[in-house]
Amino acid sequence: MTQANNTVYTDLSVDELVKEALQRGEGVLADTGALVVETGHRTGRSPADRFIVEEPSTQDAISWGPINRKFPADKFDALWARVEAFNNAQDHFVSYVHVGAAAEHYLPVKMTTQTAWQNLFGRCLFINPEQFNPAGRDQWQILNVANFVCEPERDGTNSDGCVIINFAQKKVLIAGMRYAGEMKKAMFSVQNFLLPAADVLPMHCAANIGEEGDVTLFFGLSGTGKTTLSADESRYLIGDDEHGWGEGVVFNMEGGCYAKCIDLSEKNEPVIWKAIKHGAVLENVVLDANKHADYTDVSLTQNSRAAYPLEHVAKRSEANLGGEPNAVIFLTCDLTGVLPPVSILNNEQAAYHFLSGYTALVGSTEMGSGGGIKSTFSTCFGAPFFPRPAGEYAELLIKRINGFNSKVYLVNTGWTGGGYGVGKRFSIPTTRAVIAAIQSGALVGAETEHLDIINLDVPKAVPGVETELLNPRTNWADKAAYDEAAKGLAKLFIENFKKFEVSDAIKAAGPQL
């Protein structure tokens, strides 16, 4: 379709999008055939530039604050018109996709992007349905115009770029943003607001299925191991990041994966390694003279990424969904070296640790967090993406766990034997052995040992894991130093948890001093 001197490219194939991106100088090909692009000064999400339009449907339903920032409806309309006019004056790309694999819960989306590569990214990450919108639902629109420059005084934005969600109009406006992860996370936030009304728990987690149909969920912030640990050659992948849990089903919201590439190796992450081929997009990955990706080079960012469709994963759930989970795993990257490699949680502890969302920002996906590593609490293991009050998600989690009798575990992929800089990080093979033990059922009813200050129960034996690793205190040369570190961590938990209005039973399930 042509509009006054420009072309609208609709539903191009992957090959055509790659060709357009190369012809327009948007990227280059790696030796694997993946398209390699750079995203400019933003190499991660920009939380300070994300807004939700305040209108009757959102006014009293959203937890407003520094994460969910209000944007006036009239300002949105003016900015949308301005960005749309800018985009319509040049070539752009349109694809029709779904968000949500379950037939009852998909959102039909018209995705418009200024660049070919961001359209390819969307085709990697969203679902490309055989038939678009068979239920005839109202359509959402994404308008993603990377080269538009916002003017804060005129547009009401925080900077030269913005991400604004308008629930009343079913629109997502992304302007001035080259980092494509904004697109997928915006639609995740949309589903996270809508799904609880349908009694579905939206989750920032990965999911996979065993040969017997048993499902495991992996909750965790970026860098804690969701993508790596769910990409298991012995199991079928559902997805690596965004899922819904309803009665009888866990479904992927996406049609692809978005893997961190820092230090990626074929040995440790063979599934991801093999998926990076023609049709995949590499963001901010440095190539050598032979067009070979150097995943150890962090000169552009620690948050280098690979986007690829699920079709690039040999063992996957063809239906993009599974049954309810037998095992729910909360992944935490503990910088203090205090937490054990695995703890078995009861329901109250599950609610406590879900609300706390304790972990570290590792090679953070957020702009402005720097390259360093620091501890953080992120409610529901994904605070930036959950617009409703946290308690609503926690109540749904407990309802789902109770309903299916799912077992819940806290798995530390961080440090042991001392804090960051002193101790050592658990190896991926060690964590994989912990996960395998959980999935085999070996820890159900296992004999445990109680750790007082952090108030956790650890199994006395885990197949494939050295026994001396299980109790973190025994790993520290200086036991008094461990106790002090444990008290310090407990204080952080207790201070963070003061903001939650929950039952005394849940409050008592956390660390105690």
From Swiss-Prot:
Which lineage is the organism of this entry classified under, starting from the top rank?
Bacteria, Pseudomonadati, Pseudomonadota, Gammaproteobacteria, Pseudomonadales
The entry's cellular-component GO terms read: cytosol
Give the pathway.
Answer: Carbohydrate biosynthesis; gluconeogenesis
What does the UniProt record say this protein does? Involved in the gluconeogenesis. Catalyzes the conversion of oxaloacetate (OAA) to phosphoenolpyruvate (PEP) through direct phosphoryl transfer between the nucleoside triphosphate and OAA.
- Primary localization class, coarse: cytoplasm
Query: What is the name listed in the Swiss-Prot or TrEMBL entry for this protein?
Result: Phosphoenolpyruvate carboxykinase (ATP)
Per the UniProt entry, what species is this protein from, by scientific name?
Pseudomonas putida (strain ATCC 700007 / DSM 6899 / JCM 31910 / BCRC 17059 / LMG 24140 / F1)
Gene name per UniProt? pckA
Q: Which GO terms describe its molecular function?
A: ATP binding; metal ion binding; phosphoenolpyruvate carboxykinase (ATP) activity
**Quaternary structure per UniProt?**
Monomer.
- Entry's family note: Belongs to the phosphoenolpyruvate carboxykinase (ATP) family.
- Entries under InterPro entries matching the protein: PEP_carboxykinase_ATP, PEP_carboxykinase_C, PEP_carboxykinase_N, PEPCK_ATP_CS
Q: Where does substrate bind?
A: 45, 179, 185, 305
Specify whether Nucleotide-binding is a keyword of the entry: yes
